[in-house]
């Protein structure tokens, strides 16, 4: 059984364990049926990523009247998500095999990161390589990683490609209680992966200012 979700936000999927797969089609428009059929019958490979987080239960979701950031969005979640921000599968088997920062890292310059992504499967597909950053020093930094770059890459079966990201030095900023933005930490961790920062098919690299 395949569950097809025509929704505008996250939803409760109580029967997910009884499903062989879940296809989230959002509101696909007039030609949505044809697009869904192409995916279901293998004419195309799915390659989208979640722009939101699916919580495991209502207890984990903040109240709509609560404006604090505690446990809100992927950047502040304290528990494991059901399906995290950035999650999404394809019909193939892709992974990031290498990731490295090019040149020196400083507070005044952008960060250049090169990643290698490979399609180890037998199906042509697109993959979205995602880059996240985390400040490991500042007490004002967000709890988890923050998305700082992504690129869609088309990969033939067995193909490997190199992808370069230019990450703004603003990605290293924190925001204090007065709304001021500045770089407070000296130790940052960059993560490049093909699923999301919570999954292991990725590479991490530590950088110091």
Residue spans for each PLM region:
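Single conserved hydrophobic/aromatic residue that forms the stacking wall/gate
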Residues: 1-13, 199, 206-209
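Intrinsically disordered, low-complexity Pro/Gly/Ser/Thr-rich segments with frequent PxxP/GP/PP motifs
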Residues: 142-174
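Short, conserved secondary-structure segments in the cores of folded domains
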Residues: 2, 101, 149-151
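Terminal connector regions
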Residues: 170-201
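Short acidic/His/Gly/Ser-rich catalytic and metal-binding motifs that mark active-site loops
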Residues: 14, 140-141
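Secreted, periplasmic, or luminal enzymes acting at the cell surface/secretory milieu
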Residues: 9, 14-126, 132-134, 185, ...
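Short coil/turn motifs at secondary-structure junctions
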Residues: 120-122, 136-138, 170-172
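Active/binding-pocket-proximal capping segment
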Residues: 130-138, 145-147
């Amino acid at each position: 059984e395949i569950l097809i979700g025509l929704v505008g936000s996250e939803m409760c999927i109580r029967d997910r364990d009884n499903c062989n797969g879940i296809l989230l089609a959002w509101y696909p428009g007039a030609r949505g049926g044809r697009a869904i059929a192409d995916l279901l019958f293998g004419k195309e490979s799915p390659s989208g990523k979640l722009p939101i987080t699916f919580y495991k239960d209502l207890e984990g979701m903040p109240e709509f009247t609560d404006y604090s950031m505690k446990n809100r969005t992927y950047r502040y979640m304290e528990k494991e998500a059901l399906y995290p921000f950035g999650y999404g599968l394809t019909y193939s088997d892709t992974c990031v095999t290498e990731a490295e920062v090019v040149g020196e890292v400083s507070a005044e310059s952008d960060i250049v990161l090169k990643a290698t992504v490979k399609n180890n499967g037998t199906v042509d597909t697109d993959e979205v390589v995602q880059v996240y950053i985390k400040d490991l020093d500042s007490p004002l930094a967000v709890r988890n990683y923050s998305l700082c770059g992504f690129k869609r890459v088309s990969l033939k079966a067995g193909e490997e490609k190199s992808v370069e990201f230019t990450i703004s030095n603003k990605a290293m900023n924190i925001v204090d209680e007065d709304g001021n933005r500045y770089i407070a930490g000296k130790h940052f961790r960059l993560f490049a992966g093909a699923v999301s920062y919570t999954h292991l098919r990725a590479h991490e690299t530590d950088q110091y200012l």
